[in-house]
Amino acid sequence: MSITRTAVSYYNLGYVEHAEADFREMLDHGCTTVILAVTEFDFDFWRPNIPRIVEAAHRLGLQVLIDPWGIGKFFGGEQVSKFLQDNTGNRQVSALTGEALPYACFNTPSFRDYFARFCLTLAREAGADGFFWDEPHYAFPKSYASITGGAGEDWTCRCPVCMGKFREHYGYEMPKVMNDDVKRFRRREALFILEDTSRRIKELDPAQEITCCVHATLNSYYVTEHRGYDDWDEVAASPYFDVFSTTIVAWNLPRGFFEEITRRTVAAARKYGKQSERWLMGYYRQPEDFAEIDRTVELYESLGVDRLGTWTYRGGYGTVLAAPDALKLWDRIGENYKRVIGKGK
Ligand SMILES: [Zn+2]
């Protein structure tokens, strides 16, 4: 049992020769995989260079996964959404206020088509090894996610499309209070868009590998995120996903939290014959003592995690979300990557 993949995310796609230099630096940091964060703008504007960048990564020996970063604000990420800019409709709607929100409703045919076209076009053109589904989520609630916060009351989505589907399926108007039917409806619809697109990608090329990365929450009696992907069994059981991954945990959260999330991630993945993946926070914040990075990697390793991921290249250096000592953080993560990836060979 050992860690077989070490990934880092990479954005600001543009010039192949610049990406190539960055890929060399990733190799020097023990990375086996680059997760290309392809924004809606990149897709719209830089598309000719995306396959060339993938080719450069392959030439250097990196595996490449494509992350439709922040698409429609359905996935996690800071990027702005062209879909939201170009469409005033097809947005998630607050159950309590009826307001349309700056999040695409991924249950609408319009956004589903947009998402599928984005991914299938890249599956055909880019020549990458697979896709990374990055923190898919409903806009609300998330207050449930906090281990200190209380339960949120508002939720999404009560747009005309969701309300119509709900009525058709359950035979009554979608309530404003989140009952069990609403919970099931939200989860079922949320899974559909990812499964449908994954299936179509694999039909195009069966070798394409899909990682589904959901929020790392306790999902306990007291704390449930209700973002649509809380039932890890449902997600990990999907035949269209190859890797079950759970997101970054902030360095200052208790050790026990890291341990519980990791145990449950590995257990869910193994139960359904999937690879497991856990993440390191390589931007924004850093541990007070960098040795905590070593200890966390050791914990992941000891609990049987198959793959490690880090967000993001160079600790976010140069961005508003850079870690205070971004380059040192990146180096320490790199040292850990090099240590673990040498094992089991
Ligand atoms: Zn909706």
Describe these PLM feature segments.
Residues 7-14, 35-44, 97-116, 175-191, ...:
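The substrate-binding groove and active-site-proximal loops of carbohydrate-active enzymes
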Residues 7-11, 65-69, 132-136, 181-228, ...:
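Aromatic-lined carbohydrate-recognition surfaces of secreted/lumenal glycan-active proteins
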Residues 11-27, 111-122, 223-238, 289-299:
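Short, acidic/polar
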Residues 16-43, 125-128, 237-244, 299-308:
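Catalytic domains of carbohydrate-active enzymes, especially glycoside hydrolases
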Residues 22-23, 35-86, 185-204:
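Aromatic-lined substrate-binding rim segments of carbohydrate-active enzymes
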Residues 66-126, 166-180, 195, 291-293:
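Active-site-adjacent "subsite" loops/lids of carbohydrate-active enzymes
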Residues 141, 194-258, 285-299:
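Substrate-binding cleft/loops of secretory-pathway carbohydrate-active enzymes
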Residues 246-254, 277-344:
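Substrate-binding cleft of secreted/luminal carbohydrate-active enzymes
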